[in-house]
Amino acid sequence: MVVEQIEVIEHRIIEEGRRPSGGPLLGNTVPFSTIRESRESYEQRADGTIHDRRYEVTGERDVSREPSFLHTSANYGQHIETSPPPVQRYNVSGATNSSFLNTSGDSRVSYPGADRSNDTTVINNYGYDIHEVRTDDGGARIIETHGSGPLRETSRIEHVEETITRPSAMRSSSAAAQRSSSNIFTVPAPAAHVSYRQEFASDNESLARKDSYRAMQSSWDGDEKKMTSTLNSRRFPPQSQTSLVSRETDQHSGKKIGCLKKIRTFYQGVRYAFENSEYTPELLRSLCCILLLLLLLLFLMFIIFNAIFNRYAVSEFLLYPPVCEECRRKNPALVSAALPSSVFVHFFSKHQAHFELRGNQPFKSNSFTAVDFNTGYVAYADHSLTDANGKHFTCFLMPLDRSAIDSIDQLSEAVSESSYEIQSTFGWQEFYQFDPEKIEPMTAKQKFTEEIDDCEGAQWYLLRQTVHARDASCSECYDFCLPDWAVVRKEKYEDESTLGVRRLNCFRLYVPQWSNFRVETDIGGGHWKYPLSSESTKRDKNGEWVHWIPTTNAQGFSRSRKSINNATLV
């Protein structure tokens, strides 16, 4: 452990003389004897740096450096010894005067020939104190004068020097026992690092207050000294050691403050600043700049989060079909302005995109489509093929045509460039070029990266493309047309693309669950009407049923089937 030593050296140099204020014998006057006295005290402490530097922050009065605690004047605490008084005392002018010295401070002017028989010699006391403190970081020197005036009839010099040294280890006993009796007559320069010492027998009475105060400060236990040495090695700024609240208490109290309390304190501070501040033009301009920066930051955050989450958001569009000339030819009473169909596009994952269709004419029902761009397959679930619990009992599988939609990035770009209302000028034709073929559910599940929840436990059909037209051999089959989604150009020579329906993939399928329902033609003619209306099988953008009506509770259908000639359907 490194022990630091503080040496407090006090030097007092007293020059005492008595001279008359004037007279012819001024040049023959001999001053009396001079006594020099020095006091020295040693104290050893490991935490001397903190004790000596605490006064710089707390503003305490250091009794070891304050001259008012040690003496009140130049004569305080000194024993003035004089040689045996002569028979006669002379003033400067040579006149004899046997009167005693007057130290009352009365100053009188002497002139030749004046009657000074009853006059006393005036002695003016004058002195100064020099305080020097040298540390590793620097030092300070303070000179304080006191007395009633300049030295005139008497001279007195008092020199107090306090030197603080901090050796790396304790001085040896032999070095500490060395004594020096040389007199010091010079004042040390501020820039030079020189210590002037006079070592005599220490006077415990004059430094009793200082020693007791330092003893009180050094009465800590071993743990406190170790902690102080650690803090001193970190070179913290000087702090007072006399405070009742330690640094550890402040640190622990700061850690206990919660985040909510810190926010509340910060809010209260800002509110107090706004309530008590003076609203000058400069302050208002600063507040406006801060507000603009906050708005800009919010706008940038909105753009960033929109770019991140928009890919997995749900987009809704209205699809207007082209004018159906064939439908108008078959049914002249049909209104030419068809109602639009709505579609919800949901980017389910980085590999799948889902389409939720609320179909109107020429669509015969609502449907769900899942496109897996990783495996290259498409799953269809017609909402008319559901049971009383809303579960699909039939799903369809077909390969993805890359010429229609190449990737999910292309689809995302088309969705971002599409307007809310999409007017189609071509497409939407019915193509009966597919034949359904039953496959195992396990085989169908292997065709997709993520499992299709709507087709869980359903019967799968693979739609194989053929070259023949609609098969008329099945008299009890229903016609199904599913949308073939594609990315198309908005105009012929424009680069912007949009979402569209390239065609309708149609086929005929026998549904055994509908064998007990009566067959009716739809409003367009040429197709059988599904037992479950499309108004009862709509779903929202989250995939939840809207106005769901189970098949068993559907009104307007009877349990008996009515035979209809197949020729009337052609």
From Swiss-Prot:
UniProt-annotated location(s): Membrane
Entry's transmembrane regions: 289-309
Regions of this protein lying in the Extracellular compartment: 310-570
Region (Disordered), start-end ranges: 93-116, 218-248
UniProt keyword Disulfide bond present: yes
UniProt entry tagged with the keyword Phosphoprotein: no
Origin: domain of life: Eukaryota
Keywords: Disulfide bond, Membrane, Transmembrane, Transmembrane helix
Disulfide bonds: C395-C455
Cellular component GO terms, alphabetical: membrane
Topology Cytoplasmic: residue spans: 1-288
Membrane topology classification: Single-pass membrane protein
Protein name: BRICHOS domain-containing protein C09F5.1
Organism: Caenorhabditis elegans
